[in-house]
Amino acid sequence: AYYQNGHIYINFDRCVNNTKIEVTNINTNSVISHSVNEGETIIILDISSLGCGTNYIEITINDDVFYGILDL
C-alpha cells in the first residue's frame, strides 16, 4: 500500500473477493470502509476526510491489521 495525493492505493497480486478494507484514524476514530468488488485488484481510497496533520492510521484487511503514520 502507498499514499499519494490524498489517496491510499492498495495493490493485490491476486483477486480478492468478499474482502472488507477499513482505514481508521486512531486520533479521531474516523473510519473509511471499502468492500472489494469481484475482480478488483487495485483499491483506491480517498482519505481526505481523515483530516490534516499527523494521522495514526490502522488498515484492516479482513483479519489482518496494519499500522502506519500519515502526515497530511
Please report, for each region that a protein language model flagged, where it lies by residue.
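C-terminal tail/sorting-segment detector
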Residues: Y56-L72
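Generic short beta-strand
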Residues: K20-V23, I57
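Solvent-exposed serine/threonine-rich low-complexity stretches and specific carbohydrate-binding patches
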Residues: S30-G39
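Short, surface-exposed loop/turn motifs with a glycine/proline- and acidic-biased composition
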Residues: E38-T60
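Short, glycine-anchored, charge-dense loop/turn motifs used at functional sites
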Residues: N25-V31, N55
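Glycine-centered coil/turn sites that cap beta-strands in beta-rich domains
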Residues: Y2-N18
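Short proline/glycine-enriched turn/loop motifs at strand-loop junctions of beta-rich domains
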Residues: D13-T19, N27, L50
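Generic structural detector for well-ordered beta-strands
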Residues: N11, S35, I44-D46, I69-D71
